[in-house]
A protein has these predicted regions:
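Short catalytic/ligand-binding loop motif for oxyanion handling, primarily in non-cytosolic enzymes
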Residues: 32-35, 83-86, 134-138, 143-145, ...
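A short acidic, often aromatic-flanked loop/helix-cap motif at beta-alpha or helix-coil junctions
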Residues: 101-107, 160-161, 247-254
Length: 267
């Protein structure tokens, strides 16, 4: 194992297949309160006390089973899971990596984990997903192979950017291209962080820039991942191309479990 400056232990995990090497990254954090809206009925796994229950396989079962079914490599970052739980569910292809306590929200900190892991482990294709409400329908390697000109692939949310309090953060942190966002916010769909992927170099750059942006923002209690995502893909990486929704992911919160024409189902 390797230990980085944040205290994360890393397993060098490679797929030596003759095909493109693809990794799915996710997280299962239980030591801090779940940061999503407690009044949202679509949030899965949040207990009455605000925390996600420890050692609860049902929390990740659908995601886990879909990884196994598609014979994919995956890494799940965790903080409060028991060694017995990890030993029971870890396989040659699905690895659990425990992390030390952290200051950011559960949603934000996972990207620091992803960045650090990829700096030590190189793949061809990288996707991150939520573990509680995302299912992998089929190997997303094909999606990337069939779309050479696209850098990022993402889930599309169910609302427009203007319906999300994005501009508050844009103003607060003095981000660039404010006028562009104001002009387009009623037409732009909100990009959802629950599924994002691309080629290794693009995703490592994405995670590095996410972490850099997040550190500059300060205020670690702010659950910022959705805000930073919009800013990165629509402004910082405006010379790169991204697609969202079909064929990457099902319609968000429509629970389209029967779909086989997309690569991921997100709620």
């Amino acid at each position: 194992m390797l230990v980085d400056k944040l205290g994360l232990e890393f397993i060098i995990c490679r797929n030596h297949s003759s095909l493109m090497n693809t990794i799915i990254l996710s997280s299962y954090f239980t030591e801090k309160i779940h940061p999503n809206d407690p009044n949202d009925p679509n949030v899965i796994g949040r207990s009455a006390n605000g925390y996600v229950k420890k050692n609860n396989f049902s929390y990740i079962k659908n995601w886990y089973d879909s990884i196994v079914k598609n014979n994919l490599n995956a890494v799940l970052f965790c903080d409060g899971l028991s060694e017995e739980f990890i030993k029971t569910h870890e396989t040659d292809k699905i690895k659990f990596i425990k992390v030390e306590p952290f200051e950011y929200s559960n949603n934000d900190y996972r990207f620091f984990c992803f960045r650090n892991y990829l700096e030590n482990n190189e793949y061809d294709c990288v996707f991150h997903t939520d573990a509680s409400d995302v299912v992998v329908v089929k190997d997303p390697t094909e999606l990337i192979q069939d779309n050479d000109s696209i850098n990022y692939f993402a889930c599309k949310d169910s609302i427009k950017l203007a319906e999300f309090p994005y501009m508050q953060a844009h103003d607060r942190f003095n981000w660039k291209n404010k006028v562009m966002f104001l002009i387009n916010q009623n037409n732009w769909d909100l990009i959802n962080m629950g599924v994002v992927g691309g080629r290794y170099e693009d995703m490592l750059l994405f995670y590095k820039k996410f972490c850099e942006t997040r550190i500059i923002m300060g205020n670690p209690e702010f659950n910022s991942d959705m805000w930073v995502l919009q800013y990165l893909l629509r402004s910082v990486f405006n010379e790169k191309k991204f697609i969202m929704g079909d064929p990457v992911c099902s319609e968000f919160k429509k629970y389209e479990k029967q779909r086989k024409d997309v690569y991921f189902i997100h709620k």
